[in-house]
């Protein structure tokens, strides 16, 4: 019997208009994976933050056309992925999108999946490196919202936990970096979205996987004495976040009169953190010191990146295991100390 496969792409989401900035912020900060407090306290805090940050965030989104570009780019990725898969498999399949904090929300996506009536579901996060705050939150939210009809049918659900070392994912980064390399006197800053230190200390493998990705890229670049560093951006509030900060390292490079190449290492789509934070705010720091500032594009619809997603899906489609949760390499990448990882512990 022919399989009928529902593939779900997860991403963060973003406001599709300035009016939707406040509800987007509320949804973000109301997520227990982001603010781990009981209700009604979490609800109150999310309400306060969304009110306080609304106007500032609206000004930021005004700089990029008054809305997030994330959904449009994810739709383009979906179309390319669908086209590629149709060339390679005979099974019936459909690719769905589920944004965590904006439309299409989880219930809308699940209703579409129900109409499609799949024989199995594959969950593919557009977060290469796992975090409990991104992939973990999206997968949990999806599974919690599956209603009784789907649950009682016992449809296999296969989950791609992460793919920080996927071969074509690494090659896609390397190809984009090589296009922009200078001859001399530059440093590469691999800029990832920051997380509070307490989340990492609680067993989240995010920073470990970021390091693994960067290590693989640097090895593939094969540049002798390459000057590079992993940095973190987008910190919010007074608590301790992962360090070093991207803006501080740009400042340091400026003082040393060293040109900067920025690689957005944890983002696979252009959105406010790349288009405003990296392209506008951080570039001003480089301009102050009159150093060259080059920002590598996100992987987006890069052909090699789409190939990497395709290869991951092919592997999972061919697996007979039901309710599988593993990395793209079918093994647990993280040491056992990272207890928030979705994969089973290593033997």
UniProtKB/Swiss-Prot annotation:
Binding residues annotated for Fe cation, in chain numbering: 193, 273
A molecular-function term among this protein's GO annotations: metal ion binding
Top-rank taxon: Bacteria
Record keyword rRNA-binding present: no
Key words, A-Z: Cytoplasm, Heme biosynthesis, Iron, Lyase, Metal-binding, Porphyrin biosynthesis
Keyword Iron: yes
GO biological process: heme biosynthetic process
Name used for this protein in its record: Ferrochelatase
EC number: 4.98.1.1
PANTHER family for this protein: FERROCHELATASE, FERROCHELATASE, MITOCHONDRIAL
Reaction(s) this enzyme catalyzes, per UniProt: heme b + 2 H(+) = protoporphyrin IX + Fe(2+)
PROSITE patterns: FERROCHELATASE (PS00534)
Cited InterPro entries: Ferrochelatase, Ferrochelatase_AS, Ferrochelatase_C, Ferrochelatase_N
GO cellular component, one term: cytoplasm
Family per similarity comment: Belongs to the ferrochelatase family.
């Amino acid at each position: 019997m022919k399989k009928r496969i529902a593939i779900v792409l997860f991403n963060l989401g973003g406001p599709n208009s300035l009016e939707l900035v406040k509800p987007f912020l509320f949804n973000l900060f109301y997520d227990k994976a982001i603010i781990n407090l009981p209700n009604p306290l979490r609800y109150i805090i999310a309400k306060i933050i969304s009110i306080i940050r609304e106007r500032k965030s609206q000004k930021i989104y005004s700089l990029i056309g008054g809305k997030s570009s994330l959904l449009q780019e994810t739709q383009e990725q979906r179309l390319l992925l669908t086209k590629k898969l149709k060339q390679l498999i005979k099974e019936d399949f459909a690719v769905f999108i589920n944004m965590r904090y904006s439309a299409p929300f989880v219930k809308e996506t699940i209703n579409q999946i129900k109409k499609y009536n799949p024989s199995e579901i594959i969950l593919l996060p557009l977060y290469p490196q796992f975090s409990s705050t991104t992939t973990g939150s999206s997968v949990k939210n999806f599974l919690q919202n599956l209603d009784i009809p789907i649950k009682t049918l016992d449809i296999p659900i296969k989950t791609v936990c992460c793919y920080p070392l996927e071969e074509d994912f690494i090659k896609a980064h390397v190809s984009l970096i090589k296009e922009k390399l200078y001859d001399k006197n530059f440093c590469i800053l691999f800029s990832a979205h920051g997380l509070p230190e307490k989340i990492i200390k609680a067993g989240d493998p995010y920073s470990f996987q970021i390091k693994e990705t960067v290590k693989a890229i640097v090895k593939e670049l094969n540049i002798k004495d390459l000057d590079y560093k992993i940095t973190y951006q987008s910190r919010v509030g007074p608590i301790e976040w992962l360090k070093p900060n991207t803006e501080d390292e740009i400042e340091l490079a400026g003082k040393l009169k060293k040109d900067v190449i920025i690689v957005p290492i944890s983002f696979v789509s252009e959105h406010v953190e790349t288009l405003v934070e990296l392209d506008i705010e951080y570039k001003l720091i480089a301009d102050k010191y009159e150093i060259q500032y080059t920002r590598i594009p996100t992987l987006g619809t890069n052909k090699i990146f789409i190939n990497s997603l395709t290869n991951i899906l092919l592997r999972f489609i061919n697996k007979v295991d039901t309710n599988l949760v593993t990395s793209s390499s079918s093994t647990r990448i993280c040491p056992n100390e990272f207890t928030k990882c979705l994969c089973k512990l290593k033997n």
